[in-house]
Amino acid sequence: MELLQVLEPEECPEKSKWYALVPCGQSPSSRVGHTCLYLPAAKDNGKGRIVIIGGANPNGSFSDAYIIDLDSHEWDIPDWEGLLPRYEHASFIPASNSDNIWVFGGANQSGNRNCLQLLNLEMGTWQSPSVTGTPPSPRTFHTSSAAIGDKLYVFGGGDKGPDPVEDTQLHVFDSATLTWSQPETYGSPPSQRHGHVMTAVGPKLFIHGGLAGEKFYNDMFCLDINDMKWEKLKVKGDVPSGCAAHSAVAFGKHIYIFGGMDISGALNTMHKYDIEKQSWTQLKYDSPLPPARLDHSMCIIPWRVCTELKNRNFVNSGDDNKLEENLEGKAVSKREDLHQRKKDEEGSSEERDIQLCLIFGGMDTNGEIYSDCNITIIDDHF
């Protein structure tokens, strides 16, 4: 298997290439079923952090968290306490309070969970607040992309082994009021399934794929929370095969899915779904791909790059002693002035953020469990 090129801090990645991200310090152990979130920077011009929560390996489930500090390019292990061990859970950050991280559901070795826990980043302790309303039944529900505003939306999930939970009810948790509800929906919802992806784009929720027993799905459903009507979308293009345990993120008008498994085994393909055109595209890469995997995590992160500014202010007529005009219409006449100003301009640079897709961990169908970070550029470059 070919190794991926390592992307260094502030290095600008090339389009259509995968890279390895290798922060310094102690990285998490190999794991599956964890979640991954981007935490915006608390200070001006900061790069932010990536937090990985929970997960499991054959020895047990985890109650830890790891952070990648994008400013220092280092792993950090926060001393947060109180998280119940869990994997294949959901996590989200409310829009109105970016200092709070919520987790829901998942499982540990003794069975499925349906509890909620809250971490306030300033306090640094996981809490189990009292909530009202009827919660979903215990289930696995592996996502970090199913929240709109302050609300987490839950549909389907795993019961035991290959079997999904029986209900096809939409469950909504409002973190502002600490309330569960089951709003009435219209139209035909997706069939019972687990291992699907559920991704929010604006006021719409998209569900793709999943598994029920031995049946893999490749369908795509949409629910607009403004009218609460389910719609099975008629998609076209490079439609992915039926798959489950894949990951999804949304950026702009596109949804990206990576990996998972189908009837042939683990996958390492990336597909892009155009929401407006209802069309799938399988993305092609000029580099090796990450190892095939399922039950990993994925998120969008900003990546600070440093770009050299090229000189665009001067026109060379072939005679440096002649009067020259820059693009602003100002005249310059001395060769020394021209050369010095060109040197100053060419030596300057600017910083900007581009968007990358990051995947961490997961496993293949042969039992190989990963602890690697892989990234690729996604924003308007395909």
Predicted regions and their residues:
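Kelch-like beta-propeller repeat domains
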Residues: M1-F382
